[in-house]
Each structure stands twice: as structure tokens, then as C-alpha cells.
């Protein structure tokens, strides 16, 4: 087993990478849905839908660099993360930033960008960041359920929205002990803005564009949700690494595992977007 991580790669970097490497040295993997792949894909890419990929990584090589891509980067982020955790390869794993849109020289105008957290913050600050992210996730799922026709994936969204509040309460117990001026959970949760997006942009405003962006906003919603759950997963792993108390560390790892399960739930729902 190898201790593997993954790296982001831009479209221009990937094009140069392909020009400078032998085909036997790398594999490009398209993790989108079948109808997306047939409409256009990176030449030579191996097609493995994300749901199928996460069920069995055995089709990927251990002796070649692997580059994952999707529509705009959310699903491939999950693919790269989970493949790296398998420890199958000693080679480099890449995630194509911006997905096939960036490859084609396009961008998804207005697509919400998940806020990146500062890993150098003190533990008590990371705890607040984590609770804010959980509230943001809850706001995201609630907004989607209230404003979009998402019947095929509604049970998944309902389950996830409830889980976000449960996670926030779990984190609160640790924050309460670490804070010099603790308040009740309800007071703190109410005070949190739940801003999971860069620049403090309104979540409702940022997501409203999804209604008209494509014929199938379901995929775009799930892709953003997968990206959001990955961010939470990464945050909890970081907090676990920084925490010296074994009990708290294990709790963060448990929540990180739950966030990974959320990613898998969302991936399984991709086939419902027809």
C-alpha cells in the first residue's frame, strides 16, 4: 500500500503534460455520466462513471499517473481524493481544475466557489469554521429543497440536511470546552452566517443561476454538493491531525468518515439525474 495524495492540474498544464509524456505513462479518466461523455470528451480518456468507479478501483493502473476530470471539477475532486486513499498507486494522482469546461476554454459563469479554510488557524477557530461549514451545508440543502424540483434526489437531500445539524452539535461540544466565552448551541448556531462560498456571496443568490444554466440542473447541484462535502471531509481530517487529545481526534475522524459517506450518497444519486 502506498501513502498517496493528489494534486490539482490546470487545463494548460494538462495539455503540456500530454505533449511531454508517453501514453504509457498516464491515464486520463472521465468520471461524468454517459450522456455527458458522448457529447464530448478529452481524446483518449477512459470513461468510468463516478458511481461505478467508487465501487471498484481495480480498473485503474498502479504504475501510471492518473488524471481525473468531470464537468467543472467537483466530481473529479471526490474521485481523486478517494482513489488516493486506496493507496493503490505510487504515481501521481491529478484532479483537473475546472473540468472539461476549462479544457475547452470555457468557464461556468457564476458557479459557486466553495470557501477554502485556513489550515493554520487555532483549533478553537477551526471548530467555528467547521460549525459554519455545517450550517452552510444545511442552508444549501434546505435552499435546494425549497426552490428546485428535485424529487428524484429529495430523500438524499433531506437525510443530509438533518445530518449537518447533528454534526454541528457534535462539534459544538468540543468548541464549548475550548472557548473562553461559550454560549448555548442555539445562540451560536443562530449567529453563524453559514457562508460556505468565497467572498461571502449570498448562498441563495449564488445558487439561483442553476435553475436556467442547463436542461439538467440536478447534476450541477450534486456536483457542488460533492465538492462541499469534500471540503468538510478535508477540514475534519486537518483538525484531527492537529488535535492531541485522542478522544477528540477520534471524534473528528468519525465525522470525516461520515462526510465521506455523504459524498458516496451523493455519487449514488447521480444516476437519478435524468
Spans of model-derived segments:
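Flexible, polar/low-complexity N-terminal or interdomain linker segments that lie immediately upstream
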Residues: 1-27, 31-39, 108
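Long, non-catalytic architectural segments outside compact domain cores
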Residues: 146, 152, 162-163, 168-177, ...
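Short amphipathic alpha-helix with an adjacent loop that forms part of the alpha/beta core around
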Residues: 16-20, 55-62
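A structural feature that tracks compact, well-ordered secondary-structure segments
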Residues: 126-146, 156-161, 170-172, 221-241, ...
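Carboxylate-rich helix-loop segments that flank metal/cofactor sites and access channels
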Residues: 109-112, 179-216
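Active-site-adjacent scaffolding segments
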Residues: 94-100, 104-121
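Catalytic cysteine-centered active loop of the rhodanese-like fold, especially the PTP/DSP P-loop
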Residues: 57-102
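Short loop-to-helix capping motifs
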Residues: 150-151, 245-246
